[in-house]
């Protein structure tokens, strides 16, 4: 807003760093470890502001938070804007407005490069030779540039992104030779993915039929062969609608899920907001208003399961599983609220989130995803996180340096995500559009236990 409205200021920093001290505690086994202390961690009974001192853009150990990544992007002084609101109708070229916010430096001091990417593949690159002037009075220097793009034949599921990067031509005088310096002073990403491209319906006519469908009184066991020749098996609880024990070649991949999930671990700003305790689902259970409706295709290649989920809140939710004989499962979920979920209104609580949760078996540590990354990001803080293909591990997703354990590890704009073991076997989840996802070794309910204030971070400093 501070760039689009003349009467709005913004982008100011409240605190640069979390104001905390490394503090020693004695563990139950008599050993000692350290954590980042705050509030009343040293002298009980004295007035304190709890963890209010922990709102910096750097952690207490001076490493950057994901907020610092966003801050750097928001403060950059070269910015790019689309001339046309709809950038998906390119017709072979696009126009971009370039704005120079430097007070004394023209853009001739920088190298400006662009790259067109299809998914994670770069299909064309180029440079912009600009001499956009610096500010004059209170007016920024700006000009409009045209980028010629190759003709492409996009298909449903393809993602096209244009990335623009600005780097210094000459190393700055203030930068000594012993400092790490990535040379990037500004960047932007534009989504050029055409809209309206629909995926073709899954054609299961060429699939082999299920090898086995055992329909018991309360559990249906389904087995078959994947497209790669692996043997899969899963169990469906007809009473609860929960899928469990999904195995590939005898190894359990998915222990349980998906189940509705409405609980998000509170962050520090959420403390005044009331969450309905009924939303907690520590055991990942699910209840139905009526028995599951199950229909097996006469060709033995497709099973549809329809569920009317019983919820602890004033809302309705239906779920559908389309289970195919190659091991793929298409999950559809519809949530219809009957309440405003307005905290502060008599008898109403906030609804932290609407989603699904799955419990993956141990050993599936390798994480790969296509979406905003690589740092944790949220819907109100993701413009600095470029859409791309990222690899990590589940252990690396938990952000342990927050003074008070809170919601963390989220990624937005997810097209697909996967978890695999050392052998490369695993589980992949993809979306028709985009979703948010996280992969953690702890549940949201574990981060904010109901019995204590959980004063210590779950992972000590050493």
Show the residue positions of the predicted features:
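Short beta-strand elements
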Residues: 172-204
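Beta-strand/loop-rich accessory regions of lumenal/periplasmic or secreted enzymes
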Residues: 149-157, 193-462
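Extended substrate-binding grooves/exosites of carbohydrate-active enzymes
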Residues: 1-96, 101-108, 113-121
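Short structured motifs
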Residues: 80-82, 97-100, 124-131, 145-149, ...
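Residues that line or immediately flank small-molecule/substrate-binding pockets and catalytic motifs
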Residues: 15, 130, 250
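Hydrophobic beta-strand positions in extracellular immunoglobulin-like domains
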Residues: 98-102, 116, 149, 166, ...
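Short, acidic/polar linear motifs in exposed loop/turn regions
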Residues: 101-106, 170, 339-341
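Intrinsically disordered, low-complexity Pro/Gly/Ser/Thr-rich segments with frequent PxxP/GP/PP motifs
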Residues: 118-174
């Amino acid at each position: 807003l501070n760039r689009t409205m003349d009467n709005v200021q913004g982008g100011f920093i409240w605190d640069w760093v979390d104001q905390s001290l490394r503090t020693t505690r004695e563990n139950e086994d008599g050993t000692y470890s350290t954590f980042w202390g705050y509030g009343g961690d040293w002298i009980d009974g004295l007035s304190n502001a709890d963890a209010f001192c922990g709102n910096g853009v750097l952690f207490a150990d001076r490493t950057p938070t994901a907020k610092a990544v966003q801050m750097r992007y928001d403060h950059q002084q070269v910015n790019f804007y689309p001339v046309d609101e709809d950038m998906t109708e390119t017709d072979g070229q696009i126009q971009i407005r370039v704005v120079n916010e430097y007070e004394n430096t023209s853009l001739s001091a920088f190298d400006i490069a662009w790259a067109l990417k299809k998914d994670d593949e770069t299909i064309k690159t180029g440079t912009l030779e600009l001499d956009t002037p610096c500010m004059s009075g209170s007016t920024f220097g700006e000009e409009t540039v045209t980028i010629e793009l190759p003709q492409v034949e996009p298909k449903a599921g393809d993602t096209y992104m244009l990335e623009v990067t600005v780097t210094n031509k000459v190393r700055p005088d203030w930068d000594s030779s012993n400092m790490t310096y990535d040379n990037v002073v500004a960047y932007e990403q534009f989504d050029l993915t055409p809209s309206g491209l629909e995926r073709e319906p899954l054609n299961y006519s060429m699939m082999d039929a299920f090898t086995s469908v055992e329909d018991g009184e309360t559990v249906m066991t389904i087995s078959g062969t994947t497209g790669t020749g692996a043997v899969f098996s899963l169990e469906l609880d007809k009473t609860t609608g929960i899928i469990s024990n999904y195995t590939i070649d005898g190894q359990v991949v998915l222990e349980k899920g998906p189940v509705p999930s409405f609980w998000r671990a509170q962050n520090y700003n959420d403390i005044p907001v009331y969450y309905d305790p009924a939303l907690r689902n520590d055991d990942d259970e699910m209840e139905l208003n009526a028995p599951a409706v199950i229909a097996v295709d006469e060709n033995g290649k497709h099973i549809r399961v329809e569920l009317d989920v019983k919820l602890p809140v004033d809302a309705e939710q239906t779920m559908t599983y389309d289970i195919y004989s190659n091991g793929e499962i298409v999950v559809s979920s519809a949530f219809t609220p009957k309440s405003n979920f307005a905290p502060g209104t008599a008898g109403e609580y906030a609804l932290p989130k609407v989603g699904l949760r799955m419990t993956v078996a141990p050993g599936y540590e390798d994480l790969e995803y296509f979406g905003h990354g690589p740092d944790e990001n949220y819907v109100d803080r993701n413009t600095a996180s470029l859409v791309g293909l990222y690899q990590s591990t589940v252990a690396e997703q938990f952000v342990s340096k927050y003074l008070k354990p809170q919601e963390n590890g989220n990624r937005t704009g997810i097209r697909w995500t996967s978890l695999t073991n050392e052998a490369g076997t695993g589980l992949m989840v993809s979306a028709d559009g985009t979703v948010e996802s996280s992969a953690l070794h702890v549940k949201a309910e574990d981060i904010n236990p109901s019995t204590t204030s959980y004063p210590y971070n779950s992972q000590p400093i050493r």
